[in-house]
Amino acid sequence: MANTTFKGTLRSEGGYSSIATATGTGTETTQMSISSADFASLDANKLATEAGTGITGGTGTIYRSSVIREGGIIKTSILIDLTGLRSTASGDIIGVDGTSNVCHIGQITAARNGTILAGRMTCFEAPTGGDPDINVHSATEGTGVEDGAISSLTETLLVNAGDATLGSVVIFTAVPAADEFQYLTLGDTTNADNTAGKLLIALFGYEA
């Protein structure tokens, strides 16, 4: 269908949706919608590659991502409930216990997330069960698994956070490069599943 340009007010009583249609299959995916209840949803605005199943497969685990462009600033958010994810030993990757599923929490790309300039991690619920000393690394590989040493990857420590406590905010001392994957890692040793813990990672970038 050709482009259509309207001048003046466009009105729709039942809401509005913008869709994308997959080439070949014709499958339609909602990119953006505004419901008749005044609820706006930007469905397509998330990481191009979200967390591996070594994160999303946890029992009780919640993972969501968001990418929003406001003017010249691109904000990437990753929200995680750690429930069901295993902590093991210092320097190891956090994820679902006893699996070989990849445990990154998403990939940063210049096309989607821009060039990252700064980052922070906020704790909305202190981790319990597992160890609360949780750090964030990036790595060029997306193959890291639970209980694997982050040092076995080509990695960079983004923040040495110390123990996460309710309301704690830590600022990244390094930022991920384009195409790198993010990982949650342990800064201490407690070999157990998390029974609580809510973290929000926010990365701020720009289009170079």
Indicate residue ranges for each PLM-predicted region.
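Ser/Thr/Pro-rich, low-complexity mucin-like regions
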Residues: A192-N194, G205-A208
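Beta-strand-rich interaction surfaces with strong enrichment in secreted/lumenal proteins
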Residues: S90-I94, I105-I108, V170-A174
